[in-house]
Amino acid sequence: MTPDRRHFLSFASLGVLGAALLGSCGGSGAEAAEHFPVRMSEAEWRKKLGPEAFAILRKGGTERPYSSPLNDEHRAGIFACKGCGNPLYSSKTKFESHTGWPSFWAPLPHAIGMRTDTVLLVPRTEVHCARCGGHLGHVFNDGPPPTGKRYCMDGLALVFHPKG
Protein backbone atom coordinates (compact mmCIF):
# COMPACT_ATOMS: atom_id res chain seq x y z
CA MET A 1 0.00 0.00 0.00
CA THR A 2 1.35 3.43 -0.88
CA PRO A 3 1.87 6.04 1.86
CA ASP A 4 -0.78 8.33 0.36
CA ARG A 5 -3.39 5.59 0.34
CA ARG A 6 -2.44 4.49 3.87
CA HIS A 7 -2.82 8.07 5.16
CA PHE A 8 -6.14 8.46 3.38
CA LEU A 9 -7.50 5.22 4.88
CA SER A 10 -6.24 6.19 8.35
CA PHE A 11 -7.93 9.60 8.19
CA ALA A 12 -11.12 8.10 6.74
CA SER A 13 -11.22 5.57 9.59
CA LEU A 14 -10.75 8.33 12.15
CA GLY A 15 -13.58 10.30 10.55
CA VAL A 16 -15.96 7.33 10.79
CA LEU A 17 -14.92 6.68 14.39
CA GLY A 18 -15.34 10.35 15.28
CA ALA A 19 -18.80 10.44 13.71
CA ALA A 20 -19.78 7.33 15.66
CA LEU A 21 -18.60 8.82 18.95
CA LEU A 22 -20.31 12.14 18.30
CA GLY A 23 -23.48 10.37 17.20
CA SER A 24 -23.59 8.29 20.34
CA CYS A 25 -23.41 11.48 22.36
CA GLY A 26 -26.21 13.12 20.40
CA GLY A 27 -29.12 14.09 22.56
CA SER A 28 -32.07 11.79 22.42
CA GLY A 29 -35.22 12.05 24.45
CA ALA A 30 -34.91 14.47 27.32
CA GLU A 31 -31.13 14.85 27.02
CA ALA A 32 -31.15 17.67 24.46
CA ALA A 33 -30.82 21.25 25.67
CA GLU A 34 -34.45 22.20 25.15
CA HIS A 35 -36.88 23.66 27.64
CA PHE A 36 -40.26 22.05 28.23
CA PRO A 37 -43.21 23.17 30.38
CA VAL A 38 -42.91 20.13 32.70
CA ARG A 39 -39.48 19.85 34.33
CA MET A 40 -38.12 17.77 37.19
CA SER A 41 -34.71 16.86 38.52
CA GLU A 42 -33.21 13.56 37.45
CA ALA A 43 -33.90 12.16 40.94
CA GLU A 44 -37.57 13.22 40.72
CA TRP A 45 -37.95 11.59 37.28
CA ARG A 46 -36.31 8.37 38.54
CA LYS A 47 -38.69 8.22 41.51
CA LYS A 48 -41.78 8.97 39.40
CA LEU A 49 -41.00 6.61 36.50
CA GLY A 50 -39.07 3.65 37.89
CA PRO A 51 -35.91 2.29 36.23
CA GLU A 52 -37.34 0.90 32.97
CA ALA A 53 -39.53 3.87 32.03
CA PHE A 54 -36.78 6.27 33.15
CA ALA A 55 -34.30 4.58 30.79
CA ILE A 56 -36.68 5.14 27.89
CA LEU A 57 -38.30 8.50 28.61
CA ARG A 58 -35.29 10.31 30.06
CA LYS A 59 -32.31 8.48 28.49
CA GLY A 60 -33.68 7.60 25.04
CA GLY A 61 -33.66 3.83 25.50
CA THR A 62 -35.81 1.27 23.70
CA GLU A 63 -37.84 -1.58 25.15
CA ARG A 64 -37.65 -5.10 23.73
CA PRO A 65 -40.05 -5.68 20.83
CA TYR A 66 -43.34 -7.44 21.70
CA SER A 67 -42.80 -6.75 25.42
CA SER A 68 -45.51 -4.10 25.87
CA PRO A 69 -49.10 -5.04 26.74
CA LEU A 70 -50.12 -1.90 24.82
CA ASN A 71 -49.41 -3.79 21.58
CA ASP A 72 -52.65 -5.66 22.24
CA GLU A 73 -54.67 -2.66 23.45
CA HIS A 74 -57.58 -2.21 21.02
CA ARG A 75 -60.16 -0.33 23.11
CA ALA A 76 -61.24 3.21 22.29
CA GLY A 77 -59.26 5.80 24.22
CA ILE A 78 -56.16 7.94 24.44
CA PHE A 79 -52.49 7.00 24.77
CA ALA A 80 -50.72 9.57 26.97
CA CYS A 81 -47.15 10.27 28.07
CA LYS A 82 -46.23 8.24 31.14
CA GLY A 83 -43.98 11.07 32.30
CA CYS A 84 -46.47 13.93 32.40
CA GLY A 85 -49.89 12.67 31.24
CA ASN A 86 -49.87 14.68 28.00
CA PRO A 87 -52.42 13.12 25.57
CA LEU A 88 -50.39 11.91 22.56
CA TYR A 89 -52.34 9.52 20.31
CA SER A 90 -55.95 8.53 19.75
CA SER A 91 -56.71 4.82 19.55
CA LYS A 92 -58.34 5.67 16.20
CA THR A 93 -54.85 6.11 14.70
CA LYS A 94 -53.33 2.93 16.17
CA PHE A 95 -52.54 0.13 13.72
CA GLU A 96 -50.81 -3.25 13.72
CA SER A 97 -47.34 -2.65 12.25
CA HIS A 98 -45.96 -6.13 13.08
CA THR A 99 -42.82 -4.45 14.48
CA GLY A 100 -43.36 -5.28 18.15
CA TRP A 101 -44.07 -1.73 19.30
CA PRO A 102 -47.35 0.21 19.54
CA SER A 103 -47.68 2.12 16.26
CA PHE A 104 -49.83 5.05 15.17
CA TRP A 105 -50.28 6.88 11.88
CA ALA A 106 -50.78 10.35 13.43
CA PRO A 107 -50.31 12.11 16.79
CA LEU A 108 -52.81 14.44 18.41
CA PRO A 109 -52.27 18.11 17.47
CA HIS A 110 -49.31 19.78 19.23
CA ALA A 111 -48.68 16.64 21.33
CA ILE A 112 -45.20 15.73 20.16
CA GLY A 113 -41.95 17.23 18.99
CA MET A 114 -39.35 15.70 16.70
CA ARG A 115 -35.61 15.95 16.20
CA THR A 116 -32.91 14.12 14.28
CA ASP A 117 -31.40 11.19 16.17
CA THR A 118 -27.96 9.99 14.99
CA VAL A 119 -27.23 7.51 17.78
CA LEU A 120 -27.06 4.59 15.30
CA LEU A 121 -25.11 6.67 12.72
CA VAL A 122 -28.06 6.52 10.34
CA PRO A 123 -30.21 9.61 10.91
CA ARG A 124 -33.69 8.84 12.23
CA THR A 125 -36.49 11.08 13.42
CA GLU A 126 -36.88 10.83 17.19
CA VAL A 127 -40.29 11.61 18.71
CA HIS A 128 -40.59 13.23 22.14
CA CYS A 129 -43.40 14.56 24.31
CA ALA A 130 -44.02 18.26 23.66
CA ARG A 131 -44.80 18.86 27.36
CA CYS A 132 -41.95 17.09 29.22
CA GLY A 133 -39.47 16.22 26.45
CA GLY A 134 -39.61 12.50 27.26
CA HIS A 135 -38.36 10.17 24.51
CA LEU A 136 -41.27 8.21 23.05
CA GLY A 137 -39.85 6.45 20.00
CA HIS A 138 -39.25 7.21 16.32
CA VAL A 139 -41.28 8.01 13.21
CA PHE A 140 -40.77 6.27 9.87
CA ASN A 141 -42.17 6.81 6.38
CA ASP A 142 -43.61 3.30 5.96
CA GLY A 143 -47.02 3.67 7.61
CA PRO A 144 -50.53 3.32 6.23
CA PRO A 145 -52.72 5.98 4.59
CA PRO A 146 -53.69 8.69 5.09
CA THR A 147 -50.28 9.91 6.38
CA GLY A 148 -47.86 7.19 5.29
CA LYS A 149 -46.20 7.60 8.71
CA ARG A 150 -45.47 4.99 11.38
CA TYR A 151 -45.02 6.53 14.82
CA CYS A 152 -43.29 3.58 16.50
CA MET A 153 -43.61 4.15 20.25
CA ASP A 154 -42.15 2.46 23.30
CA GLY A 155 -45.06 1.09 25.32
CA LEU A 156 -43.24 1.86 28.59
CA ALA A 157 -43.35 5.55 27.65
CA LEU A 158 -47.15 5.49 27.37
CA VAL A 159 -50.22 5.04 29.54
CA PHE A 160 -53.62 4.15 28.10
CA HIS A 161 -56.82 5.89 29.21
CA PRO A 162 -59.94 4.07 27.97
CA LYS A 163 -62.78 6.18 26.65
CA GLY A 164 -65.71 6.63 28.97
List the predicted regions and their residue ranges.
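Residues immediately within or flanking Cys/His clusters that coordinate Zn2+
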Residues: 78, 126, 149
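N-terminal post-signal-peptidase region of extra-cytosolic proteins
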Residues: 59-74
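C-terminal segment of N-terminal export signals and the immediately downstream linker at the start
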Residues: 23-56, 64
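Cys/His-coordinated zinc-binding microdomains
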Residues: 85, 133, 153-156
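Mid-length scaffold segments of soluble, non-membrane domains
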Residues: 72-103
